Swiss-Prot record:
Gene Ontology biological process terms from the UniProt entry: D-amino acid catabolic process; tRNA metabolic process
First-level EC class: hydrolase
Molecular-function annotations in GO: D-tyrosyl-tRNA(Tyr) deacylase activity; Gly-tRNA(Ala) deacylase activity; Ser(Gly)-tRNA(Ala) hydrolase activity; tRNA binding
Transmembrane segments: none
Protein name: D-aminoacyl-tRNA deacylase
The organism of origin for this protein: Chloroflexus aurantiacus (strain ATCC 29366 / DSM 635 / J-10-fl)
């Protein structure tokens, strides 16, 4: 399970001209589900995001979590996060979970955040959506549940 999280002042998602989800201060979470993801990935990622200290304290340091600031989350499913662009000019999405597997896991992820007392708004799974946001910072991170399982010394997927 892969999430692109953006710290926002506000964000909304529109489907067919109607706003279906909106938040104020918090995180926009673009969520991709891999064909190997399970409920364990849901819990691992939800816990990490809920506790991640990416909001500034009174000294301007990243010391506060989404929970600490009373922020909300806007969760938008996005299978394109599992695009494979290594070959050709058209991305392949074979690593992305099929909708019948992905949709329940996206719902479970939103529920896992709610269970941690985070207000959650969502997009519509499988719909063409327009996402609007005002970045705060900007602060944007990519978190992958598979990487969260690696030993800390294993390094990241991209060497600097």
């Amino acid at each position: 399970m892969r999430a692109v999280i953006q710290r926002v002042r506000e964000a909304s998602v529109t489907v067919a001209g109607e706003v279906v989800g909106a938040i104020g201060n918090g995180l926009l979470i673009l969520l991709g589900v891999c064909h190997t993801d399970t409920a364990e990935d849901v819990e691992l990622l939800a816990e990490k995001i809920a506790q991640l200290r990416i909001f500034s304290d009174h000294e301007g340091k990243f010391n506060l979590s989404l929970l600490d600031v009373g922020g909300a989350a806007l969760v938008v499913s996005q299978f394109t996060l599992y695009a494979d662009t290594r070959k050709g000019r058209r991305p392949s999405f074979t690593a992305a979970a099929r909708p019948e597997i992905a949709a329940p896991l996206v719902d479970a992820f939103a529920a896992a955040l709610r269970a941690r007392n985070i207000p959650v708004a969502t997009g519509v799974f499988g719909a063409m959506m327009q996402v609007a946001l005002i970045n705060d910072g900007p602060v944007t991170l990519v978190i992958d549940s598979a990487e969260l399982r690696l030993p800390r010394r294993a390094g990241s997927r991209v060497d600097s």
